[in-house]
């Protein structure tokens, strides 16, 4: 929740007047429970979506996630049906993605070209599987945590939100 990448995307949403909720998955930080291979984390995401819809019923839902959270938010999108989806350096090599359908949402993927954890080529191949393909923004030289590149990440998210 306090990750600088997550904070940067949340700030872009807030600059568009969108309410935001950031949270830790089970077993992270002060959250109860333990890691559940993505299954429980999808349920965590859907619980937060339900709370957000109850608090802001008129707001269009945007899901965003970074790395493992990028995978979880994409899988949760099948149930939550967001208007927009932002996936930052999503963990696309997970088996859960082998047969996933493209979400109906407007979809942005932001990937660092020099990501040392999630290979850029894997994300590009993943994005190319879908029709229509998601909007893919590759930041040259950016690593997994976008050190020194957060303004460009923010700009990509901000521009996507302005156009979708």
Range-by-range predicted roles:
Residues 1-58:
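Serine-hydrolase catalytic machinery in alpha/beta-hydrolase-like enzymes
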Residues 103-111, 115:
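Short beta-strand/loop motif that positions the catalytic acidic residue
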Residues 129-145:
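Catalytic histidine neighborhood in serine/cysteine hydrolases
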């Amino acid at each position: 929740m306090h990750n600088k990448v997550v904070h940067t995307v949340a700030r872009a949403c807030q600059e568009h007047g969108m309410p935001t909720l950031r949270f830790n998955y089970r077993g992270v930080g002060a959250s109860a429970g333990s890691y559940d291979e993505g299954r429980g984390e999808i349920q965590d995401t859907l619980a937060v979506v339900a709370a957000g819809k109850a608090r802001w019923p008129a707001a269009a839902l945007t899901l965003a996630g970074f790395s493992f959270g990028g995978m979880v938010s994409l899988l949760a999108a099948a149930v939550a049906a967001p208007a927009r989806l932002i996936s930052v350096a999503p963990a696309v090599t997970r088996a859960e993605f082998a047969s996933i359908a493209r979400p109906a949402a407007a979809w942005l993927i932001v990937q660092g070209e020099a990501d040392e954890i999630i290979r850029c080529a894997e994300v590009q191949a993943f994005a190319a599987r879908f029709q229509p393909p998601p909007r893919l923004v590759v930041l040259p030289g950016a690593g997994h945590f976008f050190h020194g590149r957060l303004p460009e990440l923010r700009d990509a998210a901000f521009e996507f939100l302005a156009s979708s």
